[in-house]
């Protein structure tokens, strides 16, 4: 078994960190030695608002209060009741919270955390963000490709992946898609180990797992800690078979420390304070009972036999108990010993504060874009039946619509029906684009985690998703539908007009998809952008339909057309189809008689009734409007993504 000072382990970390940009010699030494994380008098405050929307009041709440401790290589557990303190402490140590509310010092081997500490340490969130539509190896290759510098050879990356697969006993499952909770958890850990960072944070890694799977995960973490890694994780009431593997234990409640030290000394610490521990009791349950005020002790002898019947009294009792336990720990010899070590580590570092909020990437934009597109296409292939069903429905619907309009003839009485077909094409592009709002919503948590961990920049993710998701799922179905309908219906058969129509359909589809994207990028639920976009398109399509029969918008509502995406697309399709058409052939006396009292005989007449300019600009102005609308909406989408990444860090 490798020791904590194993030169092989340190050399592997050095090879990786030498390739990191903006990493100086001091940072290299800090991160390649046995990583000892110390935190000194840290407090964390959050500002919350309450009240009515226009009369909200802001309150500052102290979530962590004057916490100090040290985490050495090994298994460092953070336990506590369900009040959010343990996960908050973990996130603060991992630099995954807004640093503006943080006070105190957090050091690595006695030096301030690097500004890009989030990118030079591993973090496994409580809710797994593994892509379940690709294999375990594909997930690891994605992590290695984006988090390791391009200067590292492909063979070296493959070697690291194979080592991690063997370490976590994933060799047999490497070509399986991670669907089970246990496999997803191990895959999440493996993705962090590929980078060989010396510190790994895990937020409740055993949540939702059975005892056997929990034991397997903890044993995996223990094997990693024996390699010299510092494993820091939060956990809730583990069994003794799990607890016995812990090297360090930190008990927190109400934002205060109840105990911090060797895990095996915790029972003796509370025994010496007067708490009676029964041999058959689980240590983790015993600690939480003490924190929750469930045990009488020498500090509470005057309250023996008292029954708390009300919730408020129970809450007040717990608050008093945690306060007493925190004071007891602050006056204990254990804290004095820890304080002496912390003071020695701190030295003069109080003058060198680091915000630890910078996110750096070790790969260039094009490299990130390529891998995001490849991963998106693999994800796309992971839903084959969805693709097949969508294709079948598109073909059937297009064939039905084309057949229904197959009766179109080049005469005057078919003008409105021809325009109705183009209106139906416009409706299809708009309605099918509504679901585009889910593109950035369903991957929101994964995006936050991967971006914060240094996988890619926001720009790479943005353009990669647009190219890999919208083209196969939005543009191709729209193009296929329009192509089949156009050919079967037998409208204006000209190569120039055909390709112009396809170009118009693509621009319209992308512009229509940009609207739900701009709304969905800032939302947590798919229902919100779907509802808003549906209302918008129904409203705008209604007015576009009125213009088909009345010739123009209602005078008092004419301004609406300037904000209507369907309006611009429909007008462009009309211009392309009707310009140069003659619906009253002079050599067909039967059709001439049918057109005797009919007003419209040429396509130009119909376009003029619709208020469409007959010049080339009358066509291209609609394209320009659609492109400008698309650019504005996609810009809003990008800004939304930039804002989202700053709201909550993962």
UniProtKB/Swiss-Prot annotation:
GO terms for molecular function: ABC-type transporter activity; ATP binding; ATP hydrolysis activity. InterPro entries: ABC2_TM, ABC_transporter-like_ATP-bd, ABCG_dom, ABCG_transporters, P-loop_NTPase. The chain crosses the membrane at residues 388-408, 421-441, 470-490, 499-519, 528-548, 624-644. Pfam families: ABC2_membrane, ABC2_membrane_7, ABC_tran. Highest levels of expression in thymus and spleen. Detected in lung and small intestine. Residues 37-279 form the ABC transporter domain. Keywords: Membrane, Transmembrane, Transmembrane helix, Transport. One of its GO terms (cellular component) is membrane. It comes from the Eukaryota. Signal peptide: none annotated. Residues 1-387, 442-469, 520-527, 645-648 are cytoplasmic. It is a multi-pass membrane protein. Residues 381-644 form the ABC transmembrane type-2 domain. It is found in: Membrane. Residues 409-420, 491-498, 549-623 are extracellular. Belongs to the ABC transporter superfamily. ABCG family. Eye pigment precursor importer (TC 3.A.1.204) subfamily. May dimerize with another subunit to form a functional transporter. PANTHER family: ABC TRANSPORTER G FAMILY MEMBER 28 (PTHR48041), ATP-BINDING CASSETTE SUB-FAMILY G MEMBER 3 (PTHR48041:SF70). This is ATP-binding cassette sub-family G member 3. The gene is Abcg3.
């Amino acid at each position: 078994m490798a020791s904590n000072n194993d030169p092989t382990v340190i050399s592997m970390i050095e090879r990786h960190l030498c390739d990191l940009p903006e990493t100086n010699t001091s940072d290299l030494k800090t991160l390649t030695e046995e990583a000892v994380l110390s935190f000194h008098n840290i407090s964390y405050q959050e500002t919350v608002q309450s009240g009515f929307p226009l009369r909200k009041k802001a309150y500052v709440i102290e979530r962590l209060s004057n916490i100090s401790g040290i985490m050495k290589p090994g298994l460092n557990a953070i336990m506590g009741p369900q009040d959010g303190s343990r996960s908050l402490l973990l996130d603060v140590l991992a630099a995954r919270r807004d640093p503006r509310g943080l006070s105190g010092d957090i050091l690595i081997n006695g030096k301030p955390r690097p500004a890009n500490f989030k990118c030079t340490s591993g973090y496994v969130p409580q809710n797994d963000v593994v892509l379940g539509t690709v294999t375990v190896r594909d997930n690891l290759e994605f992590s290695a490709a984006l988090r390791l510098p391009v200067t590292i050879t492909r063979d070296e990356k493959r070697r690291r992946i194979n080592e991690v697969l063997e370490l976590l006993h994933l060799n047999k499952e490497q070509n399986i898609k991670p669907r089970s909770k246990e496999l997803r958890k191990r895959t999440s850990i493996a993705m962090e180990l590929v980078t060989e960072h010396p510190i790994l944070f895990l937020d409740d890694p055993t949540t939702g797992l059975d005892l056997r799977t929990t034991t397997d995960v903890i044993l995996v973490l223990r094997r990693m800690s024996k390699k010299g890694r510092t494993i820091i994780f939060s956990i809730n009431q583990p069994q003794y078979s799990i607890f016995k593997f812990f090297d360090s234990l930190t008990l927190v409640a109400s934002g205060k420390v109840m105990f911090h030290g060797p895990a095996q000394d915790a029972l003796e610490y509370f025994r010496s304070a007067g708490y009676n521990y029964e041999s058959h009791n689980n240590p983790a349950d015993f600690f939480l009972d003490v924190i929750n005020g469930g045990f009488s002790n020498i500090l509470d002898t005057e309250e023996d036999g008292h029954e708390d019947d009300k919730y408020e009294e129970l809450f007040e009792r717990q608050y008093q108990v945690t306060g007493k336990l925190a004071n007891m720990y602050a006056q204990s010899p254990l804290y004095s010993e820890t304080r002496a070590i912390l003071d020695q580590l701190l030295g003069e570092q109080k003058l060198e504060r680091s915000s630890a909020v910078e996110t750096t990437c070790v790969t260039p934009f094009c490299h990130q874009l390529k891998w995001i597109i490849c991963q998106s296409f693999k994800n796309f292939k992971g839903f084959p039946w969805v693709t097949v069903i969508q294709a079948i429905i598109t073909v059937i619907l297009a064939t039905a619509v084309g057949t229904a309009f197959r009766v179109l003839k080049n005469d005057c009485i078919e003008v409105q029906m021809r325009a109705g077909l183009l209106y139906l094409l416009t409706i299809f592009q708009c309605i099918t684009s509504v679901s585009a709002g889910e593109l950035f919503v369903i991957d929101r948590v994964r995006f936050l985690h991967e971006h914060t961990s240094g996988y890619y920049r926001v720009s790479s993710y943005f353009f990669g998703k647009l190219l890999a998701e919208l083209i196969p799922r939005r543009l191709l179905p729209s193009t296929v539908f329009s192509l089949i309908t156009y050919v079967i219906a037998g409208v204006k058969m000209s190569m120039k007009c055909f390709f112009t129509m396809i170009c118009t359909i693509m621009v319209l589809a992308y512009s229509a998809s940009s609207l739900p994207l701009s709304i969905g990028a800032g939302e947590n639920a798919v229902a919100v952008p779907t509802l808003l976009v549906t209302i918008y398109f129904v409203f705008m399509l209604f007015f576009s339909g009125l213009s088909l029969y009345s010739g123009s918008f209602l005078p008092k509502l004419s301004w609406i057309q300037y904000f209507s995406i369907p309006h611009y697309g429909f007008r462009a399709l009309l211009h392309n189809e009707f310009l140069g058409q003659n619906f009253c052939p002079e050599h067909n006396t039967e059709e001439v008689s049918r057109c005797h009292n009919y007003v419209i005989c040429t396509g130009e007449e119909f376009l003029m009734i619709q208020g469409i300019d007959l010049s080339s600009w009358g066509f291209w102005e609609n394209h320009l409007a659609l492109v400008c609308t698309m650019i504005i909406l996609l810009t809003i989408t990008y800004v939304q993504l930039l804002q989202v990444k700053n709201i909550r860090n993962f």
